[in-house]
Amino acid sequence: MIKVVIFITMIIILVCGCTKESHIKEINLDEFKEKIANKDTFALYIGNDSCTHCISYRPILEKVLKDYDITIYQIDNSKLTDEEYNEFRTYINISGTPTIVFITEGEEETTLNRINGEVSRDTTIERFKSNGYIK
C-alpha cells in the first residue's frame, strides 16, 4: 500500500513539475480576425520555429512576459497557407520576424510602437512599458 501511495505521489509531482505555463498563446487567423472584429486590445507576436532570430529572441521575450505577468498572442506565420498569409497582411504588414505588434481596440495605432527583430531585454521592457503593458 505504501508503494502505491509513493508511486501516485511521484506521478503527481512529475505531472505538476512538467506543466509549463506559457505567457504566449498561439492563435490562428480566424481567432486573430475575431479579436480585431471585437476591437480587443492585445499584443501579437509574429514568428515561427524555423526563424533563427525568433529562436534566439523567444527566451528573452518569455522571461520578460513571465517577470511582468503579461500574456500575449502569437501567429506562427509558417503555419499559414499562402492565401491566409496574404489575408493576414491586409491587417498587418510585416517585413520580417520576430515582430510584436500592439493592437489597441482592434487597430494598430502606429508601426513605430512595434518590436521588430531580435532586440534586447531592456528594449523589450521599454516597448511594453511605452504601450501600457508594464506600469
Predicted regions and their residues:
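Solvent-exposed loop/turn segments at secondary-structure junctions
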Residues: 49-52, 78-80, 107-108
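Non-catalytic, surface beta->alpha helical segment in thiol-disulfide oxidoreductase systems
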Residues: 101-135
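Positively charged n-region of N-terminal signal peptides that target proteins for export
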Residues: 1-4
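Structural micro-motif
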Residues: 89-103
